[in-house]
């Protein structure tokens, strides 16, 4: 049996990032062959990752990188199972490297990034025991591009025609805080308006009961107008100065808001409801078998 030295274990730890005992065990199984140990550990990591793939990853981080000339930016979301992992250096490093690759290669879709980062993802899953996924990315290019990050959970990129980076950042901060659904009322679909009308009628059934049709129609129009103002970025009062609408703020600076992208960690992902009492009971039962 080949002798497993401390130097061999140290080298394997540095190359894989895994624990000392796990590295020593892998070296022993590989007969002291470091390259074989790495291959075996990668294979084991893939198996672990496959087992973790069904676990819902609804926490994680949003990251943004902007070009030095403020002409382009990339925003990505990488998910983990817990917010605890999202705050750890290993996860942060994976996110940063993924963002850098997406930015440098001018990727516009997550698919090629997911493929390119799969080996690193498997290694992270094997090391942390949590499912990790690169969920989405958007690249924005334009005249003036600005961004704002609220911690690691909300990120916004704003594209302006005219204006300056500081204005773009201010508007991005507003988008992070106010969460507009559309750029302007003209972008609101008939489907969204119909849904809002349906909700209004359902919630106010008692108030409108017995009222003339024209009165009800005016009530609906009022609600739709309010909805359009609340949901449209250009119609919202600017968070730093509520006396000015965001659209007017841009115009005063000689700018036009072309588009915005807002990411929030886990939005749209259905989170699992955990019954901790049942989970503990199951673990206790397992120890008695």
Curated annotation (Swiss-Prot):
SUPFAM superfamilies given in the database record: Elongation factor Ts (EF-Ts), dimerisation domain, UBA-like
Location(s) in or outside the cell: Cytoplasm
One GO molecular-function entry: translation elongation factor activity
Broad class of the protein's primary localization: cytoplasm
Cystine bridges: none
GO CC, one annotated term: cytoplasm
Keywords: Cytoplasm, Elongation factor, Protein biosynthesis
GO biological process: translational elongation
Annotated region described as Involved in Mg(2+) ion dislocation from EF-Tu, given as residue ranges: 82-85
Xref: InterPro entries: EF-Ts_dimer_sf, Transl_elong_EFTs/EF1B, Transl_elong_EFTs/EF1B_dimer, Transl_elong_Ts_CS, UBA-like_sf
Top-level taxon of the source organism: Bacteria
HAMAP family, A to Z: EF_Ts
Function per UniProt: Associates with the EF-Tu.GDP complex and induces the exchange of GDP to GTP. It remains bound to the aminoacyl-tRNA.EF-Tu.GTP complex up to the GTP hydrolysis stage on the ribosome.
Family according to the record: Belongs to the EF-Ts family.
Protein name: Elongation factor Ts
Organism of derivation: Pseudomonas aeruginosa (strain ATCC 15692 / DSM 22644 / CIP 104116 / JCM 14847 / LMG 12228 / 1C / PRS 101 / PAO1)
């Amino acid at each position: 049996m080949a002798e497993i030295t401390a130097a061999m274990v140290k080298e394997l730890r540095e190359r894989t990032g895994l624990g000392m005992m796990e590295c020593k065990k892998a070296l022993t199984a590989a007969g002291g062959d470091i390259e074989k140990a790495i291959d075996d550990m990668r294979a084991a990591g893939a198996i672990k990752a496959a087992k973790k793939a069904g676990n819902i990853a609804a926490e994680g981080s949003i990251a943004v990188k902007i070009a030095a000339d403020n002409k382009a930016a990339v925003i990505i979301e990488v998910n983990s199972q817990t917010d605890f992992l999202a705050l750890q250096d290993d996860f942060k490093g994976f996110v940063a490297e993924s963002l850098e690759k997406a930015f440098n290669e001018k990727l516009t879709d997550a698919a090629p990034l997911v493929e390119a980062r799969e080996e690193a993802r498997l290694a992270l899953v094997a090391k942390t025991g949590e499912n990790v996924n690169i969920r989405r990315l958007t690249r924005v290019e334009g005249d003036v591009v600005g961004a704002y990050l609220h911690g690691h959970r909300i990120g916004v990129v704003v594209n302006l025609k005219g204006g300056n980076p500081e204005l773009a950042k201010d508007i991005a901060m507003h988008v992070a805080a106010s969460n507009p659904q559309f750029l302007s009322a003209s972008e609101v679909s008939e489907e969204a308006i119909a849904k809002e009308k349906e909700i209004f009628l359902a919630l106010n059934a008692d108030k409108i009961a017995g009222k003339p049709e024209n009165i009800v129609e005016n009530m609906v129009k009022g609600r739709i107008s309010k909805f359009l103002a609340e949901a449209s970025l250009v119609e919202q009062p600017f968070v730093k100065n509520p006396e000015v609408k965001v659209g007017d703020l841009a115009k005063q600076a000689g700018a036009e808001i072309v588009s915005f992208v807002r990411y929030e960690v886990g939005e749209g992902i259905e989170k699992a409801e955990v019954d901790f009492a049942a989970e503990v009971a199951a673990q206790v039962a397992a120890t008695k078998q």
